[in-house]
Amino acid sequence: MIRVLSVFGTRPEAIKMAPLVKKLEEEQNVESLVCVTAQHRQMLDQVLEVFDIKPDFDLNIMKERQNLSDITVNALSGLYDLIGELKPDIVLVQGDTTTTFAGALAAFYHRIPVGHVEAGLRTNDRYSPFPEEINRRLTGVLSTLHFAPTKRNRENLLKENVMGKIYVTGNTVIDALRYTVKENHVFEDPILRNMDFSDGRYILLTSHRRENIGKPLENICRAVRRIVEGFEDVKVIYPVHMNPAVREIVFPMLENVERVFLIDPVNVIDMHNLMARSYLIMTDSGGIQEEAPALGKPVIVLRKETERPEAIEAGVAVLGGVEEERIFELAKKLLVDREEYEKMAKAVNPFGDGRASERIVKAILHEFGLSDPPEEFC
């Protein structure tokens, strides 16, 4: 019996780990344990409820206005003690959060193998995204098994001469969509529940990254105002992150703008179904860059660079940056040029086929001599 401890702490991690946790629970050769740090308490709990995941351990480190040092210290201390007590055969971490890095480091201190889900994403700019780029690089150094979503991610790891074994699996976020997107979905959020998505074109907007707080987010808000002023059939829905630094910018700039709907963050099922009903998505989220192509939705990436260049190369996304004029012009083009819109909407999703969790479980079993290796995602 392989004891697998899955560690995560934020909503994006939970969305991507949930289908993997469900697969691990089905495997008779695995004892699956889950620890959450609750780095993002409220939004994490939404995902756990949706996927019916009950953590075995909850470190509950969330504090108001905590800084990165607080998160790192509290997560590392709690995880070090827990891993020492449980002595798992492998610790799984996901992505690039502070919890990810702390979990990998705590496992390393106990000489326990680390499996890194979503390994090998890179922008090659240490401050963008911040602190995620360094978190995932350091996690890569500490990991024994690297579950790379794409071949490009594997190439990034090989260039860095990482130790351990690399498996190309696809991204587990595509697996999650199989659980969540339903044609007859009834929204939990009351504002969304009362919307007629057949009336006009809806743009889904999300922006919350640390590097965008300040002038970049102000530029994004100004571009949004111009978009709704220029297109009478367009409505913008913005689930605004609970971070006070984000809300202090967004609400004064957009709260009273006609056809812009500012709502609280929604649960993952509402979010995925909102994406499925949107005409266009504007986002600085990494996960949404992966999810939207699976739903046939063009994406304007509100960042200067992306660690997911596969989306740009496949033609499912375009790099919008954080300048007002460029964001507006890109949105305008997709709203006016039907041919350009269709070209992006119908491009092939480069991030997965819905079987990433299955491949990761099989890879873990293979490493412990209980299975053949999985077939690669390509």
Swiss-Prot record:
InterPro entries: UDP_GlcNAc_Epimerase_2_dom, WecB-like. It catalyses: UDP-N-acetyl-alpha-D-glucosamine = UDP-N-acetyl-alpha-D-mannosamine. NCBIfam families: wecB (TIGR00236). One of its GO terms (molecular function) is UDP-N-acetylglucosamine 2-epimerase activity. It is found in: Cytoplasm. Its EC number is 5.1.3.14. Keywords: Cytoplasm, Isomerase, Lipopolysaccharide biosynthesis. Pfam families: Epimerase_2. One of its GO terms (cellular component) is cytoplasm. It comes from Thermotoga maritima (strain ATCC 43589 / DSM 3109 / JCM 10099 / NBRC 100826 / MSB8). GO terms for biological process: lipopolysaccharide biosynthetic process. PANTHER family: UDP-N-ACETYLGLUCOSAMINE 2-EPIMERASE. Coiled coil: none annotated. Its main location: cytoplasm. This is Putative UDP-N-acetylglucosamine 2-epimerase. Belongs to the UDP-N-acetylglucosamine 2-epimerase family.
